């Protein structure tokens, strides 16, 4: 997540606005926590003179809540994926891919 943020900052140094991350509750990595957002915001505020805000709208949401939000709002999730291997296509084996498969297979969540 830090790499994504720093890449955005260096690619668009004159940008003014909000950069949103899709991090959510239930993942135990530093870069998926409120403290990470706060730490990165300090860097971005200094670098951009306060022009850029980092947002994580799903930070306190569990994955099933996000899936339901996608269903309710007709988000075209077939155009997205979450894979820890970072390839062009989902690997189908990492925890993120397995979670997504589980929810897609559920009768409650048809995305």
Annotate each predicted stretch with a short phrase:
Residues 1-111:
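Nucleotide-activated chemistry modules centered on ATP-dependent adenylation/adenylyltransferase
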């Amino acid at each position: 997540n830090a790499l994504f943020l720093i890449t955005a900052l260096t690619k668009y140094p004159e940008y003014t606005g909000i950069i949103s991350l899709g991090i959510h509750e239930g993942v135990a990595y530093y870069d998926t926590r409120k403290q990470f957002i706060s730490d990165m915001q300090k860097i971005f505020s200094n670098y951009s003179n306060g022009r850029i805000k980092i947002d994580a709208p799903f930070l306190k949401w569990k994955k099933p809540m996000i899936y339901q939000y996608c269903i309710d709002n007709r988000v075209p999730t077939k155009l997205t994926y979450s894979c820890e291997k970072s390839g062009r296509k989902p690997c189908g084996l990492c925890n993120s891919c397995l979670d997504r498969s589980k929810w897609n297979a559920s009768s409650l969540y048809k995305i």
